[in-house]
Amino acid sequence: MSEALSASALATLFIDARTHSAWRETPVSDAQLRDLYEMVRLGPTSANCSPGRLLFVTTPQAKARLKPALSSGNVEKTMQAPVTAIVAWDSEFYEALPTLFPYADARAWFTSSPAVAEETAFRNSSLQAGYLIMACRALGLDTGPMSGFDRAAVDAEFFSGTPWKSNLLINIGYGDSEKLHPRLPRLAFEDACAIV
């Protein structure tokens, strides 16, 4: 990978991409969701641990189950979005490490320290959420990530009896650009970065 992306590709992924709150009625297919995951799973994670898990909420019945856990400002946009991805992390992600990282006994790194396992899973599932956003943009989809929801309620409703724990939500679909607000400011390099 020695060549920079084209200006149009950078515009799609970063410069012109926006967070959407209003959605067109164009559906997102199951095949598209599979295509998204095929890209997300290739993104790097610590020791290839891949703790992120995705539950794609697509049906009216499933959306109704999610609705009570949403903060009030996130209800309408989530009910309207074709897909809401519950980005979760698997608290037992290390069970797959003999396959995912066969070069060492990486499983033991995490079974010996639950705190390290949880921190690793949460951090890396957050990283994978970023990959999902970029994969959506690359495939022509828009996103609206959210952290305004009751994690305990989501876990009880969707993940009871499993090792999955929710991290954040990402609405996915085709955004209504006419309802976008002006882009908010971003921090300048001097305010957010340092070189030593």
Curated annotation (Swiss-Prot):
Single GO term (MF): 3-hydroxypropionate dehydrogenase (NADP+) activity
Recorded catalytic activity of this chain's protein: 3-hydroxypropanoate + NADP(+) = 3-oxopropanoate + NADPH + H(+)
Cofactor: FMN
Swiss-Prot/TrEMBL GO biological process terms: nitrogen utilization; uracil catabolic process
Source superkingdom: Bacteria
Keywords for the protein's UniProt record, in alphabetical order: Flavoprotein, FMN, NAD, NADP, Oxidoreductase
Keyword Isomerase: no
Enzyme Commission no: 1.1.1.298
Sequence similarity: Belongs to the nitroreductase family. HadB/RutE subfamily.
UniProt-listed HAMAP family: Oxidoreductase_RutE_HadB
Function as written in the Swiss-Prot or TrEMBL entry: May reduce toxic product malonic semialdehyde to 3-hydroxypropionic acid, which is excreted.
Protein name: Probable malonic semialdehyde reductase RutE
Species of origin: Cronobacter sakazakii (strain ATCC BAA-894)
Gene name linked to the record: rutE
